[in-house]
């Protein structure tokens, strides 16, 4: 009787270990990703009176720490020319650098289809580097999404529409909140 219990316990333990190992191996396939993106940085509301939309380049990294939760970090570099002034001429060029940490929630997992959708929200900072006037960094918040299409088990095409709002100084930037939207596309690689 004792050997049957021992055998049953041993068999149950091995089965649980096998199931856990299989689940971990499947889940661990792409727990860490890196991405490179390019696109357009679009200013809106008051900041759009000072600068035009301009090219944007970005990189990001993400770690999946639970089956549907991701910890992400993005850096986007936007290059904006100054807008045309009423009296003629053009305002100064402004480079906007975005540094944002985010929490992402996976709405559509890549195991369900070749598509994946992660919505994200986070906080960080935006630096406004005004040509000829120095730079200032302000706290910022972020919302957005990461929409991927699987090309291979580790490579995805990526769309990354993001909305960043910096809480700026009206005297330095001309508005108390600068809304800048990096709309980028690129590639995401699972490590």
Provide a role label for each language-model segment:
Residues 3-6, 31-32, 38, 65, ...:
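Positively charged, low-complexity intrinsically disordered regions
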Residues 26, 55, 60-144, 149-151, ...:
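Gram-negative (and chloroplast) outer-membrane scaffold detector with strong preference
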Residues 47-50, 169-176:
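A short acidic/glycine-rich loop-to-helix N-cap element
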Residues 27-42, 117, 121:
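Transmembrane beta-strand segments of Gram-negative outer membrane beta-barrel proteins
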Residues 39-58, 136:
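Surface-exposed strand-loop-strand hairpins of Gram-negative outer-membrane beta-barrel proteins
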Residues 1-30:
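Cleavable N-terminal export/targeting peptides
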Residues 161-162:
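Internal, hydrophobic beta-strand segments that form the core of beta-sheet-rich folds
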Residues 41-44, 85-86, 126-129, 166-169:
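Extracytoplasmic loops and strand-loop junctions of Gram-negative outer membrane beta-barrel proteins
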